[in-house]
Amino acid sequence: NIIDVPCRPCYYRDSSGNCVYDQLGCGA
């Protein structure tokens, strides 16, 4: 199994598996 490494704080993983900055989820 491939372990999915969590994205950095304030980032989320999109449907393509990329870590994308999450403006809404980061202490707005």
From Swiss-Prot:
Entry keywords, A to Z = Disulfide bond, Ion channel impairing toxin, Nematocyst, Potassium channel impairing toxin, Secreted, Toxin, Voltage-gated potassium channel impairing toxin
Q: Where in the cell is it found?
A: Secreted; Nematocyst
Report the SS bond pairs: C7-C19, C10-C26
Does the keyword field hold Secreted? Answer: yes
Return the GO cellular component terms, semicolon-separated. Answer: extracellular region; nematocyst
Which family does this protein fall into?
Belongs to the sea anemone BBH family.
Please give one Gene Ontology molecular function term for this protein.
Answer: potassium channel regulator activity
Name of the protein in question: Toxin Bcg III 23.41
Q: Which domain of life is it from?
A: Eukaryota
**Primary role:** Possible voltage-gated potassium channel (Kv) blocker. Increases amplitude and duration of crab leg nerve compound action potential.
Give coiled-coil spans as residue ranges. Answer: none
* Organism per entry: Bunodosoma cangicum (Sea anemone)
